[in-house]
Amino acid sequence: MDRLLLDSNVVVYLDQDPGRVTQHARDQIDGASEVYVSAVTGWELSIKQATGALKMKTTVSSLVESLGFLELPITMRHGEAVKMLPMIHRDPFDRLLVAQSIIEGLTLVTSDSRLVRYGTPILQV
């Protein structure tokens, strides 16, 4: 688990309640050579902030920068890979994160146990 991609829920936990991330997951995040946060996470969390469903202490981009994480842009390849995924999960944000993790060879860090069914490497928090 050298290169990681954080699910949106993990980014929220790190902002609001770091204790929800297990010690094992924190150790893996701290020891990873690269930790990415997708642009889709910025989009998803911004929508939730705009609708009042989520309050964050800072912007997603500021949080990512302050934690020393890398931004993963959304590419056409990522978008096209979504069509190859089985309809296990209907959330378009999660489906794009799974596609990105597969295309980029990243371990997805998440609390969503349903994502394991896609076959991509998962680190549960």
Regions found by a protein language model. Give the residues of each.
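Short, well-structured N-terminal submotif of metal-dependent ribonuclease cores
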Residues: M1-V37, A50-S62, E104, V116-R117
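Acidic catalytic patch
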Residues: V60-M87
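A generic structural signal for short hydrophobic patches within well-formed alpha-helices
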Residues: V11, G42, G79, L115-V116
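Acidic, PIN/NYN-like endoribonuclease modules and their adjacent C-terminal/linker elements
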Residues: V98-V125
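Acidic donor-binding loop at a coil-to-helix junction in glycosyltransferase catalytic cores
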Residues: F93
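Generic structural signal for small/hydrophobic residues in well-ordered secondary structure
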Residues: D7-S8, L45, V82, S101
